[in-house]
Amino acid sequence: DEPEYAEAIREYQLKYGKI
């Protein structure tokens, strides 16, 4: 079970590559 912000983090990684 992922937190709701996990989806935003995935989009961030798609845009920027890594955190």
Swiss-Prot record:
Belongs to the conotoxin B superfamily. Keywords: Calcium, Gamma-carboxyglutamic acid, Hydroxylation, Ion channel impairing toxin, Ionotropic glutamate receptor inhibitor, Magnesium, Metal-binding, Neurotoxin, Postsynaptic neurotoxin, Secreted, Toxin. GO terms for molecular function: ion channel regulator activity; metal ion binding; toxin activity. The lineage of its organism: Eukaryota, Metazoa, Spiralia, Lophotrochozoa, Mollusca. Its cofactor is Ca(2+); Mg(2+). This is Conantokin-Pr2. A divalent metal cation binds at residues 7, 11. It is found in: Secreted. The keyword Magnesium applies. The modification 4-hydroxyproline is found at residue 3. The modification 4-carboxyglutamate is found at residues 4, 7, 11.
